[in-house]
Every structure is written in structure tokens, then in C-alpha cells.
From Swiss-Prot:
<dbReference type="Pfam" id="PF03250">
    <property type="entry name" value="Tropomodulin"/>
</dbReference>
<dbReference type="GO" id="GO:0030239">
    <property type="term" value="P:myofibril assembly"/>
</dbReference>
<comment type="subunit">
    <text>Binds to the N-terminus of tropomyosin and to actin.</text>
</comment>
<dbReference type="GO" id="GO:0007015">
    <property type="term" value="P:actin filament organization"/>
</dbReference>
<dbReference type="GO" id="GO:0005523">
    <property type="term" value="F:tropomyosin binding"/>
</dbReference>
<dbReference type="GO" id="GO:0003779">
    <property type="term" value="F:actin binding"/>
</dbReference>
<comment type="similarity">
    <text>Belongs to the tropomodulin family.</text>
</comment>
<dbReference type="GO" id="GO:0005856">
    <property type="term" value="C:cytoskeleton"/>
</dbReference>
<dbReference type="GO" id="GO:0051694">
    <property type="term" value="P:pointed-end actin filament capping"/>
</dbReference>
<feature type="region of interest" description="Disordered">
    <location>
        <begin position="42"/>
        <end position="63"/>
    </location>
</feature>
<dbReference type="GO" id="GO:0006936">
    <property type="term" value="P:muscle contraction"/>
</dbReference>
<protein>
    <recommendedName>
        <fullName>Tropomodulin-4</fullName>
    </recommendedName>
</protein>
<dbReference type="InterPro" id="IPR032675">
    <property type="entry name" value="LRR_dom_sf"/>
</dbReference>
<comment type="function">
    <text>Blocks the elongation and depolymerization of the actin filaments at the pointed end. The Tmod/TM complex contributes to the formation of the short actin protofilament, which in turn defines the geometry of the membrane skeleton.</text>
</comment>
<dbReference type="GO" id="GO:0005865">
    <property type="term" value="C:striated muscle thin filament"/>
</dbReference>
<keyword id="KW-0009">Actin-binding</keyword>
<keyword id="KW-0963">Cytoplasm</keyword>
Amino acid sequence: MSSYQKELEKYRDIDEDEILRTLSPEELEQLDCELQEMDPENMLLPAGLRQRDQTKKSPTGPLDREALLQYLEQQALEVKERDDLVPFTGEKKGKPYIQPKREIPAEEQITLEPELEEALAHATDAEMCDIAAILDMYTLMSNKQYYDALCSGEICNTEGISSVVQPDKYKPVPDEPPNPTNIEEILKRVRSNDKELEEVNLNNIQDIPIPMLSELCEAMKANTYVRSFSLVATRSGDPIANAVADMLRENRSLQSLNIESNFISSTGLMAVLKAVRENATLTELRVDNQRQWPGDAVEMEMATVLEQCPSIVRFGYHFTQQGPRARAAQAMTRNNELRRQQKKR
């Protein structure tokens, strides 16, 4: 035990209440002032409440504000003004500044051919606007008028240079229609191993029950014809990610897997990445835009999987760290080069 700790042991059994009872009123008031200054929230109070009383003297008389103002005004009038040390004589020194006159250059008289003179004399405002745009006199018009005149083969600024610029009218773009896929029918076809079913697209269907998605992943284990499996924006979470991981361990025909824009956490992504190592047919994997950032460990695992799986040639994820991003880019370049060499053979 150090000397400082031994010194503190003396004050452990002290009765604070007994000490406070023995203090006089003056000592208690002084202690209160010291504690107020030590309070960390004391600086948050206004100055009038933060400062303690500076004096305890009683007032010598009542305060009359009007009498005080009259006294100060009378005293100010009775005080004699001081004379200037250096009296002002009114003498002006120096010369006043006169701005020199600038010579206005004479405008050059430009003579045009009679045909051009006649054409410009009878040109309308719309034609003059297009002529100004062709001559790069863009300061006379707005940007819209300038580019419309250059890009169009006809006179488009029909109201002239001083016209009010109207906004462009864009064609309304309708929303994309909902996904027409019948989930129950797709599930039956996957279970029956339909030869004509090569793509399962359930994108943007957000009301799929979790048990049905789990059954679909279970049926995909034995399917040998489906090449593309997409679950984008289906509100899938970690249970679906674990089902997809189990499917990847047994399926040997799937080539493209897309689970972007879902609610999969780092645990679910880690399970999918571990299952990708055991799959030799998958060539495309997309896992970007999840609800939460997966973390540095998952990004390092992604780079490791791409280095150990030469079959993956397309990977969809936006890395936030420079190290995994560089490793993943190098691995993808190597995998695509290997695929190109295999096609040559």
C-alpha cells in the first residue's frame, strides 16, 4: 500500500454529519460558497445567480432614480468644457483630388454587305436570338436559350432574347409494375426440377413468408437446372441467409446469386461467405446494400473468399476499407484472366 493510500485510510471512518453539526453559521456559509464554485454546472447559470453577494452592508437610504438622473444631468451641465490644446484655424492643406477624364474610344463603323444589312434590318426577335447564339454572344441570353439555339436546326426561341425562360416539360415516367412471379408455382417447379426453369426472380416482393422462402431454398438443394437465383429487396434476414448458405453447400448448378438490399447482418453474410467456399459452380455473387454495415471482419472475409474461389468472376459489394478493396480487385482480375484462358483452350 502506497503512502497516499495510507493517508486516505485516516479519513475513511470520519463522520461527516458530526463535523457539520460542530460548524458555526459563518463556517457553513463559507463552505456553501466553496461548494458552489466547485459545482461543474455552476458555469451554466446566469451571472446574476452565479455570483455570490459582495457585501452585507445595509443601504444608507432609499434609492430615488429620478433624483439621481437629475443630479447627473445637472453635474454634466455645470462642468466647464476644456479648451483644445491646438485650436482649429480652418486652414486647408493639400490639393483636392480631381478624377481625370477618360477618353471614350470612338466606335468603329463596320460596314456589311447590302444583303446582310437588309437581312438584319428585317430580322425578327426570334431570328436575332438564334444569330446571337451562333456568334457566341451568350451574355445576351440565358443558358437554355443559348443551347436550344445551337442544338436545334430550327428557330426554337420564338419569343426573342428578352423572353421569360420556361422550364422543360418532361414526360411522366410511370412506376415499374410489381413483380408478377407466382411464388407457389415457382416453388412447385423448383421441387419438380423443371427443365425450362433456369431463373428464379423474386425481386421486390416484400410479403413473402419466411417459411416459404426457407422451403424454396430447401428445394433448390436438389435442383439441377436453375442458373440464377435473385432475392433483391425481399426483406430477407439472417434466417434466409442461413437457408441460402445451406443451399449453396449442396447445390451444384447455380451460377448467379443476388441477395442485395435486404436486412442481412454480418452473421448472415459470414455464413453465406463460408458456404461459397464449398461451391465450385457459382460465378456471380451480389450482397451489397444491406440495412447495416457488415464490418471490417466481413470485408476481410469477402476478400479471402474471392482469393480462394477462382470460379467467381463477378462480385457486387462496395468496400469501405482500402485493404479489402485492393485484395478483392486483384482477385477478380486474376479470376477473370483464368476464365479467359480456359475459354481459349
